[in-house]
Amino acid sequence: MAARCTEAVLAALGVLSVCSASSSGSEASGEAEREEPWDGAVFRPPAALGAVGIARGPGSPPPGNREAVDLPVLLWWSPGLFPHFPGDSERIQCAHGACVASRDRRARADPRTRALLFYGTDFRAADAPLPRLAHQSWALLHEESPLNNFLLSHGPGIRLFNLTATFSRHSDYPLPLQWLPGAAYLRRPAPPPRERAEWRRRGYAPLLYLQSHCDVPSDRDRYVRELMRYIPVDSYGKCLQNREPPTVRLQDTATATTEDPELMAFLSRYKFHLALENAICNDYMTEKLWRPMHLGAVPVYRGSPSVRDWMPNNHSVILIDDFESPQKLAEFIDFLDKNDDEYMKYLAYKQPGGITNQFLLDNLEHREWGVNDPMLPNYLNGFECFVCDHELARLNAEKAHASSHGDIPVPEPRIAQSSHMNCPVPTPGFGKVEEIPENDSWKEMWLQDYWQGLYQGEALTAMIHNNETQQRKFWDYVHEIFMKRNKNL
């Protein structure tokens, strides 16, 4: 799969970073190790944390007089992801106090380093820092697709972490609406029906499919291919392409993930957008869902099974899984295409008072981070402060225990739960898995990748419990787990 630098995440959030060359094979792959990885040497404060800038987090008071040398340290472990610029260390002022954020791996050995922050796409069990130090929390940021790291979709993998920020509403710092700027984004007026009727007369299909990332865990192309037998679909991009974009500029696949004005005007011609996520998981919703709604099109959606919880009202999206077959879905879309009054009911949320889902409105109103909002912090810095405040509270609890002569118990460690990701095994986009040939590329790739994630999570958990110090033993652990499982089959 195409590699990309974590810098794309920071750029989307308006945060600067320095990225190194990428060598991973995931969809949003991690960067290569920095040239000076932590080598177990004694921590040297002047080199690692000597030059500390100042940043303030959401709801934070002005900086106090506490010296940076006394503050707990948060270490960003993923190379290339550090939401501060320039330098390697930054004092951050958060709601309950201050911490030092750093990306210098030499800081790991220092007792002041209280948390390691990992970016899920970059996290590799084979390269996890060992031995795991008892006083350090592991914090996970993983807002991207489950396909980037299936280790995190299994209990043993997600429970490696103490704090999480994922697309799941159940995570400690939830990011399910990361692609939705606000309610106003949904209220943008739709094009008049007569405009789209004119495009239909010019030969445009009722349905748009725009994908260039093919062969994904959701197996969406298999479903769309079957749907095309029953209704016209204009397919752009590299997947099932049957029509060329009207301009050279729109042929650039990078443009397809943006809100480029020319692209948006082009997409607005279509009444229905096929919106199939690349992986299936509760609360995993991307621009594939929200952008059609912004443009006044009706999403024909497959992705998050919990998507109804987030819709502006109960009649704004067509769910593929509500139909017993692609043929039945095609018949329903054809009916709406020929009946403007019925079609417009799906756009009622754009009218004053049309957004009736209070759960959606409350989540948009009360989140402390924003999307392209200069008045709010981005979720990277927000999560960083969430971790800082947690570690400050944990330090205070440990001090209270120490001074109580045992009257106050030791604070219990916080452990992530399966619900913080909880992504199921991939299933075929159409048909049954036993009907698919064994040499099918989807079957060969994604089922194996999914279960390999389980073995890797179990292996790393065992290594931590055994206080292993040598990462090179990781694949021996994986092999042993694999052999035991196959022996019991």
From Swiss-Prot:
Cysteine disulfide partners in this protein: 385-388
What stretches pass through the bilayer?
A: 8-24
Q: Function of this protein?
A: Protein O-fucosyltransferase that specifically catalyzes O-fucosylation of serine or threonine residues in EMI domains of target proteins, such as MMRN1, MMRN2 and EMID1. Attaches fucose through an O-glycosidic linkage. O-fucosylation of EMI domain-containing proteins may be required for facilitating protein folding and secretion. Also shows minor alpha-(1,3)-fucosyltransferase activity toward activity toward biantennary N-glycan acceptors. However, this was tested with a library of synthetic substrates and this activity is unsure in vivo.
Q: Which reaction does it catalyse?
A: L-threonyl-[protein] + GDP-beta-L-fucose = 3-O-(alpha-L-fucosyl)-L-threonyl-[protein] + GDP + H(+); L-seryl-[protein] + GDP-beta-L-fucose = 3-O-(alpha-L-fucosyl)-L-seryl-[protein] + GDP + H(+)
GO MF entry, a single one: fucosyltransferase activity
Q: In which tissues is it expressed?
A: Widely expressed. Expressed at slightly higher level in heart, kidney and lung.
The residues exposed to the Cytoplasmic compartment are: 1-7
- Name the Gene Ontology biological process terms: N-glycan fucosylation; positive regulation of protein secretion
The glycosylation sites are 162
Q: Which UniProt keywords apply?
A: Disulfide bond, Endoplasmic reticulum, Glycoprotein, Glycosyltransferase, Membrane, Signal-anchor, Transferase, Transmembrane, Transmembrane helix
Q: What is its EC number?
A: 2.4.1.221, 2.4.1.-
Query: What does the UniProt entry say about where the protein is found?
Result: Endoplasmic reticulum membrane
How does the record classify its membrane topology? Answer: Single-pass type II membrane protein
Q: What is this protein called?
A: GDP-fucose protein O-fucosyltransferase 4
Q: Organism source for this protein? A: Mus musculus (Mouse)
Listed pathway(s): Protein modification; protein glycosylation
